[in-house]
Amino acid sequence: MLEMILKIDESIARCFFVKKVLVVEGDTEQVVLTETINRMPYDLKNQILSDWHIVRARGKAAIIPLVKYLKAMTIDVYVIHDGDFGVDGAERFNEPIKNALSDDDKLVVLKNCIEDVLGYSAPKSDKPFVAYKHIQDNWTDWSSIPELW
């Protein structure tokens, strides 16, 4: 048992100490959410940080087993992922993710990708850095975050 505990990813281990877990597709979503939280008013930020934990699935396909595992551990799970509509290799995971979560109220499927929501075209590379740079250049505080986001 101890060996298993030692092998659990630190990010997954934190899931046991919060009320809700948000599973995101990858690094870009993690960066955007972290920067969003950093700009929240003090009380809201503290409430979010004490009640929620964000876990990167590190790929759309990995969301499914991660959700199943967290649900089996009776953890309250929510998911945000790109819709990737028209992208064959990625769109096919939308329905299995929805089925694994089995609660549409806890699922947010972005129209296409997070860059669309943020208002710029998705780059071919360095997506997390480009998102971070976009936020640094455009968001000064909570009130400057786009309403669509």
Language-model region placement:
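Acidic, divalent-metal-binding catalytic cores of TOPRIM
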Residues: M1-W149
